[in-house]
């Protein structure tokens, strides 16, 4: 008859505690939290939004079973120089964004900070172009400021 690996008894508390503490490191979520890996990998460095310069416009194909070209932009962040892809939400929103424009991006709202819906690998969306909200530009309530 095989015995239990766990110590039993009146004075086994410390041993159980140490064993549990060591076992936690086998769980990926604990490791990520303990070493704050999410913050280190995050291009926005924990901030809710970030400013950046548009490097280029890109069209990404939607994942199956959808068939579309999702309009996105490559943005170089000002704070650390990292490049990320951001989705341009709204009808013809890409027409209001030009290369070398300053944009503000935020998370797209996918599950646990990941991509949302059928847009592969895109974790961010454009919120503002220059001083104007992208939503207001699309609706026609604001006009883009000409330099």
Swiss-Prot record:
Organism from which the protein derives: Methanococcus maripaludis (strain C7 / ATCC BAA-1331)
Keyword rRNA-binding: yes
UniProt KW Metal-binding keyword: no
Subunit structure of this chain's protein: Part of the 30S ribosomal subunit.
Family designation: Belongs to the universal ribosomal protein uS12 family.
Gene Ontology molecular function: rRNA binding; structural constituent of ribosome
UniProt-listed PANTHER family: 30S RIBOSOMAL PROTEIN S12 FAMILY MEMBER
PROSITE patterns noted in UniProt: RIBOSOMAL_S12
Entry's Gene Ontology cellular component terms: small ribosomal subunit
Coiled coil stretches, renumbered: none
Keywords for the protein's UniProt record, in alphabetical order: Ribonucleoprotein, Ribosomal protein, RNA-binding, rRNA-binding
Function comment: With S4 and S5 plays an important role in translational accuracy. Located at the interface of the 30S and 50S subunits.
Protein name: Small ribosomal subunit protein uS12
Lineage: Archaea, Methanobacteriati, Methanobacteriota, Methanomada group, Methanococci
Protein's GO biological process: translation
CDD domains from the UniProt entry: Ribosomal_S23
Disulfide bonds: none
């Amino acid at each position: 008859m095989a015995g239990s690996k766990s110590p039993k008894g009146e004075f086994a508390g410390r041993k159980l505690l140490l064993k549990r503490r060591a076992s936690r490191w086998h769980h990926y979520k604990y490791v990520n939290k303990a070493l704050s890996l999410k913050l280190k990998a995050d291009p926005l460095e924990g901030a809710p939004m970030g400013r950046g310069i548009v490097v280029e416009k890109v069209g990404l194909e939607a994942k199956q079973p959808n068939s579309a070209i999702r309009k996105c932009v490559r943005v170089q962040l000002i704070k650390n120089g990292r490049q990320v892809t951001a989705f341009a939400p709204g009808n013809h929103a890409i027409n209001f964004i030009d290369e070398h424009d300053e944009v503000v991006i935020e998370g797209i709202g996918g599950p646990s900070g990941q991509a949302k819906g059928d847009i592969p690998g895109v974790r961010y969306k454009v919120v503002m172009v220059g001083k104007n909200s992208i939503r207001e530009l699309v609706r026609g309530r604001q006009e883009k400021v000409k330099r």
